[in-house]
Amino acid sequence: MALKTFNPVTPSLRQLVIVDRSDLYKGKPLKQLTEGKSSSGGRNNNGRITVRFRGGGHKQTYRIIDFKRRKLDVAAKVERIEYDPNRTSFIALIRYADGEQSYIIAPQRLSVGDEVVSSQQADVKPGNAMPLASMPVGTIVHNIEMKIGKGGAMVRSAGTFAQVVGRDQGYVIIRLNSGEQRLIHGQCFATVGAVSNPDHMNASIGKAGRSRWLGRRPHNRGVTMNPVDHPHGGGEGRTSGGRHPVTPWGKPTKGKKTRSNKSTTKFIVTSRHKSKKKG
């Protein structure tokens, strides 16, 4: 997929750069693999805002994606590649030899008519799923499970990938895009290839209204607010906030470490922070 630019007929078109999706399927999604989805507007079950600057946006239908890929040793044919409003990557509709259909995350270099399979031992080609232990060192993978049978949790965004870099006592070492290297159990499934739509990162929204279509409301900085609304608020004229950056609730932000999950730290071989310092 390439990027699409426009003649600057209006100021917003001058800035606009979008992904050319002309090659994607243009019809509606498969009805039995969709379900309704209600917008929360950033509110929780008490009706209170838990995520700021969310709301509005176009109504979306949720596509049920098969992240587990546990239908083993049954070949499936790619029927079409589709747009999915719920994620940055594209999705592929596949039909198994027994007639069952499902959606999977579409990897790069997967085309209509290709065959994919999920197996304990499969060919190393885009779209095939297998345990990490079955993959050769150096394989590019995505949609990686963190717990056996739970379904892919990591590396699902547009253009992302991880690489198998080693093995260690039943575990496999993978290198993530962040530079982090971590141990994952060898029986956890992953899919071969990098996620589709790598040009997503180069797209430019072009105008405020397009952000609203996506359900994003205006994002206000703390220094533009009043003291009642934010610790950085107030002051005569434009001020810098007068203190280290904090959240609206006074917690340090911009670099403050917040990771509290100590139980899985042992699986991190190389921290993403240390890998960046070396580079």
From Swiss-Prot:
| Family annotation (Pfam families) | Ribosomal_L2 (PF00181), Ribosomal_L2_C (PF03947)
Disulfide bridges in this chain: none
Q: Which GO terms describe its biological process?
A: cytoplasmic translation
Q: According to its UniProt entry, what is the function of this protein?
A: One of the primary rRNA binding proteins. Required for association of the 30S and 50S subunits to form the 70S ribosome, for tRNA binding and peptide bond formation. It has been suggested to have peptidyltransferase activity; this is somewhat controversial. Makes several contacts with the 16S rRNA in the 70S ribosome.
Named from the GO MF annotations, one term is: rRNA binding
> Metal-binding: present as a keyword of the record?
no
Q: State what protein this is by name.
A: Large ribosomal subunit protein uL2
A Gene Ontology term for the protein's cellular component: large ribosomal subunit
Keyword Ribonucleoprotein included in the entry's annotation: yes
The Swiss-Prot or TrEMBL record describes its family as follows: Belongs to the universal ribosomal protein uL2 family.
Alphabetically sorted, this entry's keywords are:
Ribonucleoprotein, Ribosomal protein, RNA-binding, rRNA-binding
User: Please, which domain of life does this record's source organism belong to?
Assistant: Bacteria
Q: Which PANTHER family match?
A: LARGE RIBOSOMAL SUBUNIT PROTEIN UL2M (PTHR13691:SF5), RIBOSOMAL PROTEIN L2 (PTHR13691)
- Renumbered to this chain, the Basic residues biased-composition regions fall at 209-220
Matching NCBIfam families: rplB_bact (TIGR01171)
Stored InterPro entries? NA-bd_OB-fold, Rib_uL2_dom2, Ribosomal_uL2, Ribosomal_uL2_bac/org-type, Ribosomal_uL2_C, Ribosomal_uL2_CS, Ribosomal_uL2_dom3, Ribosomal_uL2_RNA-bd_dom
**How the protein assembles, per its UniProt entry?**
Part of the 50S ribosomal subunit. Forms a bridge to the 30S subunit in the 70S ribosome.
Organism of derivation: Methylocella silvestris (strain DSM 15510 / CIP 108128 / LMG 27833 / NCIMB 13906 / BL2)
Where is the stretch described as Disordered? 202-279
